[in-house]
C-alpha cells in the first residue's frame, strides 16, 4: 500500500517534484529534531522575526551573538556588547558596549537594526535566511548589511542595485515573519530562478578582478 501511494504521488506531481518535496520534508524533520534551540532563538514572538540571534549564557534571542549594533554606525567597526548594557526590542535582546550606545538604540531602535534580520544579505538575495557574521558587513545608504564572510560580501558587490532589489523583494514577500528554518529548507530545496552557487559567484568575482574592475559599495 505504501509503495502504491508513493507511485501515485509521483504520477500526480512528477518524479522530480516528488523528490524535491520528499527532500524538503526530510530536511525539515532533521532541523526540528536537531535544531530546536537555534530555531527558538531565531524566531522570537515579536514582529522582528526571523532574526540572526542565538542563545548566550542562557539568554535567548540575542542579536548577532551579542555584538553592539550601534558601534557600526558610531565607530564604523564591530564591537562586542555586554549583558550589562542590554535592551529588549520586539522580543529580541540587544547587547551594547556602553550606556551611551544603549541610550541611542532605545531612542530610535529602527535606525540601528541590521537589514534582513541580521542575516547574510547575499543569502536573502536567494530567499535563504542564514549566516551573518559580526565582522563581515558594510553600510549602504545609512543602513547596516551583514554578510556570511568575504565571499558572500564580494558576491553581493557584483551588482549592488540588483542584489539589493532582490533581497528586499524576497525579504518582504517570503522571509519576513516566516520561520527561518522552514524558509531556509524551502529555498535550499526549491531554488529561486536566479540562484548562483558559491563557486559561480567566486568565479564571477575572480573574473571581474582579473579585468582590473574593483568591487565597491556605493553609498
Residue ranges and their predicted role:
Residues 90-120:
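Mid-length scaffold segments of soluble, non-membrane domains
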Residues 1-19:
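N-terminal secretory signal peptides that target proteins for export/translocation
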Residues 37-90, 113-219:
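Intrinsically disordered, low-complexity terminal tails and linkers in eukaryotic proteins, enriched
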Residues 24-33:
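Bacterial N-terminal signal peptides
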Residues 2, 103, 153-155:
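Short, surface-exposed beta-strand/loop "edge" segments at domain boundaries and coil↔beta transitions
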Amino acid at each position: 500500500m505504501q509503495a502504491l501511494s508513493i507511485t501515485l504521488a509521483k504520477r500526480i506531481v512528477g518524479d522530480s517534484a516528488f523528490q524535491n518535496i520528499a527532500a524538503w520534508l526530510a530536511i525539515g524533520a532533521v532541523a526540528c529534531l536537531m535544531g530546536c534551540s537555534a530555531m527558538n532563538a531565531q524566531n522570537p514572538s515579536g514582529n522582528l522575526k526571523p532574526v540572526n540571534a542565538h542563545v548566550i549564557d542562557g539568554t535567548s534571542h540575542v542579536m548577532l551573538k551579542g555584538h553592539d549594533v550601534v558601534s557600526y554606525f558610531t565607530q564604523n567597526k564591530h564591537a562586542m556588547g555586554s549583558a550589562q548594557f542590554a535592551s529588549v526590542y520586539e522580543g529580541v535582546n540587544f547587547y551594547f558596549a556602553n550606556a551611551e550606545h544603549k541610550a541611542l538604540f532605545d531612542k530610535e531602535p529602527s535606525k540601528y537594526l541590521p537589514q534582513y534580520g541580521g542575516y547574510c544579505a547575499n543569502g536573502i538575495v536567494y530567499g535563504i535566511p542564514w549566516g551573518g557574521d559580526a565582522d563581515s558587513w558594510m553600510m549602504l545608504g545609512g543602513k547596516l548589511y551583514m554578510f556570511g564572510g568575504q565571499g558572500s560580501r564580494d558576491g553581493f558587490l557584483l551588482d549592488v542595485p540588483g542584489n539589493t532589489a532582490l533581497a528586499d523583494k524576497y525579504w518582504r514577500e517570503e522571509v519576513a515573519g516566516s520561520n527561518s528554518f522552514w524558509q531556509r529548507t524551502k529555498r535550499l530545496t526549491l531554488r529561486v530562478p536566479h540562484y548562483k552557487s558559491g563557486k559561480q559567484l567566486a568565479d564571477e568575482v575572480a573574473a571581474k578582478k582579473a579585468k582590473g574592475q574593483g568591487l565597491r559599495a556605493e553609498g
